[in-house]
């Protein structure tokens, strides 16, 4: 999918924490804080350029603590990836299998994606990270999730065309590429407009889809 990042204003420290100590913080809570900060850092800068020092600083812990919790920078990225990708897949699947008019499926899917990303829009760019080197375990892990989402997109666009009497596989493939690019572009636009909520985006997409359909 399209992975263009939108520019956005600086994000506050993860979960409002700055300079917090480590004592008295349950491990699960600390992991949540680290993952939130890492998701934003990886989403903004990509795995290759993300700074472990910046992540630690935002949470208020030392770099060694990040390695204690997640083993490595790669381990932390994978934890972020496995946090967002299954949620996106599940949300898309539920939107596609909802018993409603087929013509409304694109809007349901978009609304589902925005809902998952509401609190951390950068999570999309963790999944679609262009800095991951082909042939690495990280790239393979991300590709596995991307293929799942692409397969859902292929199924959905083919179903949409069949509903209009079109069974041409090349038409379906072309529409899938249009769709996946559109979703990525919309998330990128949303990222550069932080004042817009998931509900705002869902309503905007409803208007855009209505205009496109005429």
What positions do the PLM features span?
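Hydrophobic alpha-helical segments that form the core
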Residues: 2-10, 167-189, 200-212
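Short alpha-helical scaffolding segments that buttress acidic/His motifs in well-ordered protein cores
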Residues: 113, 127-128, 179, 209
């Amino acid at each position: 999918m399209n992975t263009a990042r939108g520019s956005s204003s600086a994000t506050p420290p993860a979960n409002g924490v700055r300079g917090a100590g480590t004592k008295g913080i349950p491990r699960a809570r600390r992991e949540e804080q680290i993952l939130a900060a890492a998701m934003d850092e990886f989403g903004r800068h990509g795995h290759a350029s993300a700074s472990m020092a910046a992540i630690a600083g935002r949470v208020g812990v030392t770099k060694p603590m990040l390695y204690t919790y997640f083993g490595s920078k790669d381990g932390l990225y994978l934890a972020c990836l496995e946090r967002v990708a299954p949620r996106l897949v599940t949300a898309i699947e539920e939107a596609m299998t909802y018993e409603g008019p087929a013509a409304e499926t694109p809007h349901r899917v978009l609304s589902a994606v925005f809902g998952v990303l509401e609190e951390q829009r950068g999570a999309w760019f963790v999944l679609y990270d262009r800095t991951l080197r082909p042939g690495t375990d990280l790239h393979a892990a991300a590709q596995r999730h991307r293929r799942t989402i692409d397969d859902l997109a292929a199924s959905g666009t083919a179903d949409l065309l069949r509903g209009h009497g079109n069974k041409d596989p090349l038409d379906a493939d072309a529409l899938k590429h249009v769709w996946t690019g559109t979703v990525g572009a919309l998330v990128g636009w949303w990222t550069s407009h932080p004042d817009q909520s998931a509900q705002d985006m869902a309503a905007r997409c409803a208007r855009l889809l209505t205009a496109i359909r005429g």
